Amino acid sequence: MDKLVIRGGRRLIGSVTASGSKNSSLPVIAATLLSGNGTFTLHRIPDLQDISTFTQLINHLGAQTSFSDNTLTVSTGNVESLLAPYELVKKMRASIYVLGPLLARFGEATVSLPGGCAFGPRPIDLHLMAMEKLGAEITIETGFITAKARNGKLQGARIDFPVSSVGATGNALMAAVLAEGKTIITNAAAEPEIEALCRFLASMGARIEGTGTTELIIEGVTSLSAVEFTNVFDRIEAGTLLAAAAITGGTVTVDGVEPEQLKSVLKKFAHAGCTISQTPGSITLASPEKLIPTDITAKPYPSFPTDMQAQWTALMTQAEGTSRITDKVYHERFNHIPELNRLGAHIEIRKNQAIVEGPRRLSGTKVMSTDLRASACLVLAGLVADGVTEVLRVYHLDRGYEQIEMKLNSLGADITREKYKEFS
């Protein structure tokens, strides 16, 4: 198993390019299952464990794939299996994304109940509700979801989500594009990753109105075609890299981004005293001498993203005063806090809110990753901690960050990846 060994206290300076978004790559790859014609060429796909796992899943279904230099080619003409097995699905919750495309194209699908991140309940009820609205009959037995379209074809319908859900919106979209008639999705997620999926589906021939809004109108078509597509940047990775600059007192430029998609995060960095400069394709952050405590409340886009909440918590350990961290998306997403406190932070959880007292001088020690963003949070803390910090179980980090230690080292960090035995 791998760990990251971080020698802290180094100011980060320089420029780095953002990777493609994992959170948009996965539904886009799933959407290739909607077409049996031609070969897809997908650019700017990050080289991550989750991408590898998802590619294995669609290969199991019969797709043919090739991956090189962040370009993935996919041919789905030979897809025959409609069963997504437990052995693959257990590794990541996003495997549920194959449900909508398989059901739309073939009229049925069987998917193991998913695994994935370790924080709080993340029910798939909204995914199943959307499929039922479109005319699918759902059964759950022996750990598997089986969905069958009545008369073999989904029917357009109105889908009113009670809460915003990126995953359920994506699945509903992919199912609706081949359904007969019109589908209206209200309270749809408006995240940039859903907007990217809409653009990808439209390039394939789907008819979608309302892209980028919370109401999507889809007129079903009979077939879709393979296309070439360039993925969007990873706004969470970009935000994490900017946080690394801020926590170390550095100045970093992140290239290959769309600043508008990080507006809520940049606003909070500015409140914390950072100087932000933007061009159409880059963001530069210069850290202040003293960080100002800044509260955040994580909510669906365009508000502050839940996937930046843990990183912000680490940053606020260095601010002079009290900060309050609230997560309205995943109320229990605080697994990183005990580990931050092991490093010397002073953070209390009160009624689903983290209260951060700073500044605190952090001291390196061994800490344990529990999920993807908690891992990133601990790396940020290690960058500013005195001495050596060892972040264990970085396989969580590898699920969502492409060569993160190489990028940070290029900015002046001192991080090495080493093997270790779990309980030695």
From Swiss-Prot:
Q: Which domain of life is it from?
A: Bacteria
The protein's annotated pathway: Cell wall biogenesis; peptidoglycan biosynthesis
Please list the residues that bind phosphoenolpyruvate: K22, N23
Where along the chain is the active site annotated?
A: C117
**Biological process GO annotation list?**
cell division; cell wall organization; peptidoglycan biosynthetic process; regulation of cell shape; UDP-N-acetylgalactosamine biosynthetic process
GO CC, any one term: cytoplasm
Which keywords appear in this protein's UniProt record, sorted alphabetically? Cell cycle, Cell division, Cell shape, Cell wall biogenesis/degradation, Cytoplasm, Peptidoglycan synthesis, Pyruvate, Transferase
Question: CDD domains in the record, alphabetically?
Answer: UdpNAET
What Pfam families does the record tag this protein with? EPSP_synthase
- Does this UniProt record's set of keywords contain Transcription? no
Reactions catalysed, as given in the entry: phosphoenolpyruvate + UDP-N-acetyl-alpha-D-glucosamine = UDP-N-acetyl-3-O-(1-carboxyvinyl)-alpha-D-glucosamine + phosphate
Q: Which GO terms describe its molecular function?
A: UDP-N-acetylglucosamine 1-carboxyvinyltransferase activity
Q: Which family does it belong to?
A: Belongs to the EPSP synthase family. MurA subfamily.
- Its job: Cell wall formation. Adds enolpyruvyl to UDP-N-acetylglucosamine.
Q: What is this protein called?
A: UDP-N-acetylglucosamine 1-carboxyvinyltransferase
Q: Which organism is it from?
A: Chlorobium limicola (strain DSM 245 / NBRC 103803 / 6330)
Gene that encodes it: murA
